[in-house]
Amino acid sequence: MGLFKSLFGGNNTPETEKEKNDKKNFEILKYDGIRAQRMGKLPYAIKCFEEAVAINDELETLSLLATAYTQANRLDDARITLDRMATKDPEQVNTFLSLAGICYMQEDYENMKDACQKALVLDNKNPLSFYLTAKAAIGMKDDITAIAMLTKAIVLKEDYTEAYQLRAEVLWKMKQAKDAAEDIQKLLSLNPDDEQALLLKGEILAATNEPEQAQECFNQVLSLNPFNEKAYILSGELYLVNKDFDK
C-alpha cells in the first residue's frame, strides 16, 4: 500500500502540508489582527488582515478589514473591500448597508442610493435600509422621497428615534412646523432627554412665537449638557430677537 501511495499519492503530500501551514498562518494573522484592532493598533491590524485575506478571502475577515480601513479613514480601501465582498456574496444585506455608509461619508449619494436599493431587493423589511435611502435622498436634495423613506422606516420600527429626528428635521426645513413638532413630541416621549430633539423643538417654538417655551427647551438642554454649544447659540439668538439684553 505504501508503494501505491508513493507512486500515486506522493505529489499530494507537499500540497497538504502547504494547506495546513496556510490554515495555521491564516488563523494567526486573523486573530492577531482582531487583538490589534481592539487595542487601537490599526496599522498593524490592517497589515494582519491584508495578509490573512491574501491566504483566504473569507467574508468575515474581509469585513474585519473593511472596518479597520474605515476606522483608519481609508475610505477608498474600505469601499473596494466591500465591493469585493458584494461580488463574492451578493446576497448579504449588511455588505450593501456598510457600503452605503461609506458612500455617505464620501458624499457619494448616487452610489449610496444604489447600495440601499440592492439591500432593499434582498430584504424590504429592514428599517435601516429605508433610513439610509432617506439620507441618500437628502444628499440629493430630494426631500419628498426622504420623507417617504423615513415613514416606511418608522412603520417597520415604531421606536426608531433616529428616523423620527431626521424626518422632523426635513419637515422643518420644508416649513412643515406642525408635522415636525409631532415627530419631536413622539421622539421626546421615547427619550425625554434627547438633546437634538429638544433643540429642534426650541427652534420651532422660537419661530412660531413661543419664546418662553423655546427658552425652556434650551435651558433643559444646558442642564443636561452645559457644553452644548448649539444651545447657547440658539438661546443667544432668542434673546436678541426678543431684545432681552439684560440676560
Language model segments and positions:
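Structural signature of tandem alpha-helical TPR/SEL1-like repeats
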Residues: M39-K47, A72-R84, Q106-K118, G139-K152, ...
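Alpha-helical segment of the N-proximal tetratricopeptide repeat
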Residues: N21-E60, L64-Q71, G101-E107, K135, ...
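Helix-start (N-cap) detector for alpha-helical repeat units in TPR-like alpha-solenoids
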Residues: F26-E27, L59-E60, V93-N94, P127-L128, ...
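TPR-adjacent "capping" and linker segments in tetratricopeptide-repeat scaffold/adaptor proteins
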Residues: L3, L7-I28
